[in-house]
Each structure stands twice: as C-alpha cells, then as structure tokens.
Amino acid sequence: MYHYRVLNSASSRGGVAVVELDLSAPRGTGHVALPFTGSLGPSRRDVPDHVPFGAIAPERWLMLVDYKARLVWNVYAVLLAEGAPVSFDSVAPGSVKSGFGVRSPYLPGVRTFAAIPTEQSCCTKPNAQGELPNSFLFRVKGLTVAPTVRPPDMSLAIVRSDLQQTCGPLRWIADGAVCGRLRSNLEQAIASQQGDRAATTGSLPAFLAELDAQHGPGKPVSDNAYWLLKVNGEYLLAHM
C-alpha cells in the first residue's frame, strides 16, 4: 500500500483541487484493477496499459482513470448558474491533505504527478474574449514514488539507478557524504553478487542501515528517497 499526503506550500496562491499520478506501464502489462475505496467516477476503458492498482480517496474527493492511464483524484465541485465551478474541498495554501492511497503489488519507482488548482483560485475572471480560463492550464508537475517495477524484475542495477537519481538530479538526498556511503555499500553488493552471496547479504544490510540512520526530521534522506530505496532494497535482501 502506498500512502500519500498533499502538501500545499504557504507561498502558493491557490488551493489544490486535482492530483494526477502516472501509473502507465509497458504494452502487455494489461489493465488489472484492484479494489478502490471511496468514490469512483466513470473511468475510460480505452487507456494504455497500466500497473495493477486500486486506490483510496479522502471524503469529498473522487477517483478516476484518465486517457493516459493516470490515476486522478479530484474534489467534488458544484456548477453555478454563472461563473466557474466552486470546489467543496481543496488543499488550501499552507495546509496538508492526507487520505490518498494506491494499492499495488508492484515495487516503487520514480513517477510524474501533477497538481491542478481550484477554479476559484485561478479562473473566475473572464479574459479579453469573455471566456473563463481553464484550471488545467495552471497544472504544476513534479516527481514522486509510485508503483512501477514488477517484483521479478527488481535488481541491484535498478536500485543503483534509483540511487543515482536521488543523489543527482532529483536532490532527494542532498548530502554528498551520505550519498558516497550509500553508493559504496551498494557497489560492494553488486560486485559480490556473482560470487560471494554472504558478501552481498552483508553489504546490502549496511546500505539499508545507512538509509535508516539518515532518514527523519532534519536528516538528509527525504521521505521519497527513503521509501524508494528502502522498499526495493529490502525486497532484494529477502529474495536472495
């Protein structure tokens, strides 16, 4: 089970009304649906393949699967006789909304997500043509951790690639010394993988222990980096 919370910065100028999460998968994966908990709206059937998944939504939020195999959470809204729709709920600036979740047997990888503001945050004033702007034009994109890898496909090479991303462009681990220790332990596990199983099962726990030691308030390993590397590393250790 993947649990999420949406944090809207205090400097934001609008509430969040829609969250999109990419769950697409290579052709041939299929369209396996697991249970959904909460309000499920009409979903498209002509979507690309996606990882097997179900989802959870907070109260007054709706779920659906869109034409790009994205899981979409959106707030209930009321359509007024005049003007833009008004959201019943949102993630206001400076607030946090929990209760979002994805259930899937797939292991984590780096995925794209997007947040879209409420209509009343961005789109209540007509433009020069007398038209109201579309809130989807104000989409803000980012990266998170979500179901990606089929368990039999998980490998130390994938964990190494994830570590390179978290210590590199993602900056999910911003401490170079910590990255160096993690990289050293992981490289030892990879080097010994073909020969000395005992060495591999010794280096991998050291990698996981370093993650544990460096994760928490004020520490350099972010939640995204921790759960991405921890879950995949523990899976490999358990299946060696």
Feature map (PLM): residue ranges:
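Soluble extracellular-acting proteins and domains
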Residues: 146-240
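Extracellular or exported targeting regions of proteins
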Residues: 1-150
